[in-house]
Amino acid sequence: MSVQEITETRQYLTFKLGNEIFATDVAKVREVLDLTTITAIPRTPDFMAGVINLRGSVVPVVDLRLCFEMSKTESTRNTCIVVVEVLLDNESTVIGALADSVEEVIDLEPEQIQPAPRIGTHIRTDFIKGMGKRDTQFIMILDIDRVFSAEELAAVRGQETGKPLEAAA
């Protein structure tokens, strides 16, 4: 979904990675968890923090900071896991994303969202749905379905099903 496709007010969950504020559509967010024990999985990509047990389900957890070529997420009292539902080949997949902190849920009007800059950002522009502007602050609105490439998501889904991670080896 591009900026042009946003035609109505939407709600976004805002969260911090480092000093930058990001947002994702609340419709994609299942829940926000306090940081819990994450079990590391050998031979997975660096961005794959591990898995958690969420009410009997194995949920892969990804370090978004590493996905965006930032330093690894440090554990603080504000660190949390944002559990999101993304589409891979028209199939719903639940993934946890580490965030330094969750800020708030905000409403953004279509006119408050501008296209992402094509240069000057360390995040791939196809990951960014747009730049939200609230007061004097810019918020990077993520297209959470595109944050992970098909290959990376396939590796994460392999963890859920116990299939080998040939692409990640």
Question: Where are the regions a protein language model picked out?
Answer:
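An acidic, low-aromatic, low-complexity terminal/linker signal
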Residues: 1-169
